[in-house]
Amino acid sequence: VVQVITPGTYMNYKNYDENNFLASAYKKDGNIYFAFCDIMTGDSRCTILKTMDDLQDEILRNNIKEIITIKDQELNVSAYITEVEVDENIEKEKTSNLSDSNLRICCNILLDYIEKTQNKDVNSLKNFEVYFKDKFVYMTNYSLKNLEVTQNMANGGKKGSLLSIIDKTSTAAGARKLKKWL
């Protein structure tokens, strides 16, 4: 087997303006550690969440296609979930910059899954960017939808949204960056 295709690892080159995020979630010590990356672009981010509602909101905001979690960690979210058996002590070079050990475990679970299913060296991915919701003006997914920031309410398409009006980018990478900023 050369490559395993799953919802989070499928690469649709026709819709290159959209990210295809694969994520991992790890529950420990009353927190939910959440990491996600796009294996096509290498964009990688992670955060620490407090509640399942926060997790669900991050899934919807980032259009997560698949979530990897350790067996027996129950996640009640609306996303495709893949349970894996992973050694929580695995260490990847890409996560050495992360100071929180549980966040590092979460990122390592994701990187290990990518290596195993894609036969791909994870060194081509960017280092994980840690972000915290309380450091930014934060809008829930429902607010973003009602204000039609990235998609219209009529059919969920880009046309008629704020993004469609200000998007004058000439490359797919630029379009993804602008959407990330919004």
PLM regions with names:
Residues V1-L182:
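Charged catalytic and DNA/RNA-contacting regions of genome-maintenance
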